[in-house]
Amino acid sequence: MTMKTITLHPGAVTLADLAAIYWENGTAKLDRSFDAGIEKAAARIAEIAAGNAPVYGINTGFGKLASIKIDAADVATLQRNLILSHCCGVGVPLPENVVRLIMALKLVSLGRGASGVRLELVRLIEAMLEKGVIPVIPEKGSVGASGDLAPLAHMAAVMMGEGEAFYEGAPLPAGEALAKAGLTPVVLAAKEGLALINGTQTSTALALAGLFRAHRAAQAALITGALSTDAAMGSSAPFHPDIHSLRGHKGQIDAGAALRNLLEGSEIRVSHIEGDERVQDPYCIRCQPQVDGACLDLLRQVARTLEIEANAVTDNPLVLSDNSVVSGGNFHAEPVAFAADQTALAICEIGAIAQRRVALLVDPALSYGLPAFLSKKPGLNSGLMIAEVTSAALMSENKQMAHPASVDSTPTSANQEDHVSMACHGARRLLPMTDNLFAILGIEALSAVQGVELRGPLKTSPELQKVIAVLRVVVPSLEEDRYMAPDLKAAAELIASGALVSTISGGILPKLEA
């Protein structure tokens, strides 16, 4: 399969560009109109390196060692030593699509023409993406300030022929992987090592991955929530557009509209409009637009933050428009840390309200006539009893992981870097959190579809019938107790892959861009 290549325009890269790289394992290259700006900044750095004036990152030590002047003859060694000494990551490798996103984001940052690297480095990153030389980057080791030093050092090391890289699915010594791909390691010039590792690209890539996954889950939650509403014979009256317009939150308005459209044409819904003795549904049914809509608004706010950060220069020092080279602090990932914490809250709440809907459906005291645990023969069979327990376990695990990472800080590097963002692990936890959420929503899908089928011969809406058909291809109806783990896995995969979301007609589910 031919990979999609995204042409990046630094300063104007979109979420859609980045999502294509993440979801489709795409490649990326810079628009060639940015070459001149890159070369201009590189020439300025070369000029400084040839002189005697000390400039941080070019001919000085790093961090607490910034006051030590480095001889011109040692500038290349300085950059090589920087990368090797900073390769201190631990843990399992980051997923390949996350690393591809890291590399693309680094291209964007370098492409702004403020980092002072040669075009040779940019072309090597592009070629590595194209040919599938993907650095092995351990998941842990960054505190999210002075950039994501350790993880980005592992990326830079591969460019030098050091460390490890995945090539054709296998981890290889970096030099071997480059050679197999027909690529040559680079010898870093002045400031280039620092430009490669001094940035927020790892934290931002992980936060983007979490955002994309959380938005997919948010869309799926509206589908499973609509199914649960019909399974429980819940009222669609609380989804009336005027209710949500009177409050005014865009996410709530969009979520309410999605639920209405998903339920349109349901025989089940029509069957109990008249003569239903219930006055109001529990909040997990009635307040879906308010909860899922608030989560959608939060994710959209995160999207704006991360789109800005994806286009940012987060290197230090920077070559400014007047050709001066100035030290700053753009490497501090506080905006990304906040965005990751916000995403975690949304993930947690989407799962929390979905889990309560599962609990409602399996409880005959709440489900308005459905059998206990959605089993046709309760007692002899336990039905979805323990599937609901699993959803509760995953919900509580996500609550624990949702504790803000950004409120923590610790001084590092001999107190030179005395306040840090913790953005990297704050963003990294979004991956297991969304895995849990996909599983919760998969369990809701199993429960709700089982419940809808038990309402037969009445049918749900045409849109939701399409969802049921897709689910039943991989998970048959639960007639008797059986080994359940494969069913839960298959349902979660339908959510995670986007297969469930893609069954819904265009324009119904809310997009990430408001």
UniProtKB/Swiss-Prot annotation:
- SUPFAM superfamilies found in the cross-reference section: L-aspartase-like
InterPro entries found in the cross-reference section = Aromatic_Lyase, Fumarase/histidase_N, HutH, L-Aspartase-like, Phe/His_NH3-lyase_AS
Q: Which residues form the signal peptide?
A: none
Keyword Transferase carried by entry:
no
| Pathway where it operates | Amino-acid degradation; L-histidine degradation into L-glutamate; N-formimidoyl-L-glutamate from L-histidine: step 1/3
Q: What is its main location?
A: cytoplasm
- Gene Ontology biological process terms from the UniProt entry: L-histidine catabolic process to glutamate and formamide; L-histidine catabolic process to glutamate and formate
Instruction: Cite the post-translational modification comment.
Output: Contains an active site 4-methylidene-imidazol-5-one (MIO), which is formed autocatalytically by cyclization and dehydration of residues Ala-Ser-Gly.
Give one Pfam family, short name only. Answer: Lyase_aromatic
Task: Identify the CDD domains for this entry.
Answer: PAL-HAL (cd00332)
Source organism superkingdom: Bacteria
**Identification of the protein by name:** Histidine ammonia-lyase
Which GO-annotated molecular functions does the record name? histidine ammonia-lyase activity
The UniProt keyword set, sorted, is:
Cytoplasm, Histidine metabolism, Lyase
Give the subcellular location: Cytoplasm
Which family would the database say this protein is a member of? Belongs to the PAL/histidase family.
- The EC number(s) attached to this protein equal 4.3.1.3
Which parts of the sequence carry 2,3-didehydroalanine (Ser)? S146
Catalyses which reaction(s): L-histidine = trans-urocanate + NH4(+)
Q: Where is this cross-link: 5-imidazolinone (Ala-Gly)?
A: A145-G147
Asked whether the UniProt record includes Cytoplasm among its keywords, one would answer yes
List the GO terms this entry assigns under cellular component, sorted alphabetically: cytoplasm
